[in-house]
Curated annotation (Swiss-Prot):
It is an enzyme of class 2 (transferase). The gene is Aprt. Its main location: cytoplasm. Transmembrane segments: none annotated. It comes from the Eukaryota. Belongs to the purine/pyrimidine phosphoribosyltransferase family. PROSITE patterns: PUR_PYR_PR_TRANSFER (PS00103). GO terms for molecular function: adenine binding; adenine phosphoribosyltransferase activity; AMP binding. This is Adenine phosphoribosyltransferase. Its EC number is 2.4.2.7. Pathway: Purine metabolism; AMP biosynthesis via salvage pathway; AMP from adenine: step 1/1. It comes from Mus musculus. The keyword Glycosyltransferase applies. The modification Phosphoserine is found at residues 15, 30, 66. The modification N-acetylserine is found at residue 2.
């Protein structure tokens, strides 16, 4: 992994205490999105990891609603694969599959269209941040319901003190930046 690129990405993440509720330290990626060099570096770093780990054996990137949508299509394009969307409840037309999950600060439900993937297709799930792992775990559940293979979950930021990685069990997880 390129240390200069990683530092470029890290400098563009800022913190807001007590947002959206007291006791939560929000990691804001907005400065990263404003800076094309930093954003490109984040995509290159994630793609480099996935290329070296999976040797081109990825069929799709699944972007999580909503900030995973910012990285999913660019990462998919960099890897030369398709991108599918995992949305919050009620946002997708047609038949869907759903799974409930807990956030760091609430509860919600995710959905994916039933025809989004074929059984056996190899998928990487991407989001901006891993906290408790609830969203990623629900996304894995959705893809397993479609009989797709989740080969890895990735995010820009990981909040290690919340142990979200452990919630994913045997599914590999990778993050560019780790914060306590």
């Amino acid at each position: 992994m390129s240390e200069p690129e990683l530092k470029l990405v890290a400098r563009r993440i800022r913190s807001f205490p007590d947002f959206p509720i007291p006791g939560v330290l929000f990691r804001d990626i907005s400065p990263l999105l404003k800076d094309p060099d930093s954003f490109r570096a984040s995509i290159r770093l994630l793609a480099s990891h996935l290329k070296s780990t999976h040797s081109g054996k990825i069929d799709y990137i699944a972007g999580l609603d909503s900030r995973g949508f910012l990285f999913g299509p660019s990462l998919a394009q960099e890897l030369g694969v398709g991108c599918v969307l995992i949305r919050k409840q009620g946002k997708l037309p047609g038949p869907t599959v759903s799974a409930s999950y807990s956030l760091e600060y609430g509860k919600a439900e995710l959905e994916i269209q039933k025809d989004a993937l074929e059984p056996g297709q190899r998928v990487v799930i991407v989001d901006d941040l891993l906290a408790t792992g609830g969203t990623m775990f629900a996304a894995c559940d959705l893809l397993h319901q479609l009989r797709a293979e989740v080969v890895e979950c990735v995010s820009l930021v990981e909040l290690t003190s919340l142990k979200g990685r452990e919630r994913l069990g045997p599914i590999p997880f990778f993050s560019l930046l780790q914060y306590d």
